[in-house]
Amino acid sequence: MNTNAPNLDRIAACKQGWNDSPFLKAQGLEVEETAVGRAVVRLPKALPTQRGGGGSDTVLNGGVISYMFDGALGWAIISSLLAMPEASDIDPFELRQFTINLDITFLNAAVGDSFEARGKVVRISRTTAFAEGEFLDANGTVCATAKGIWRVFWPRSIASTPR
């Protein structure tokens, strides 16, 4: 993978675009620490509407954990794709990926106010990506793990280019 400065600038710009999305803002989520093939999605302060996991007002709902994983692993994939040489001439917002499968194992109750989902790419090609991650509470306790598969869609001009 090409990890030169221009690609890192493009990754940073795309990250800002994700942080400006209405969905992430409404949920109080932020894509933070990013590197090629890695990402962290943080929930600095859980909202009352995000609680209720296991029937308790103190536990984060599993749905919140799921969409945080989807964002962290998905963003890790986007950052890897943007670092590929064939991505150097495309608009980063034209590159798409969709979740095929997201498998989550819940290990501990997610209790507290702030949480983070960490994602990293395990394997990636032009059409398919595999990623995994961990979900941690403010004390660093791993509350859940995830692994998933994503389908990658390049802009038509790139998709038709010989490999």
Question: What are the residue ranges of the model-derived segments?
Answer:
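Terminal targeting signals and extreme-terminal segments of soluble enzymes
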Residues: 1-163
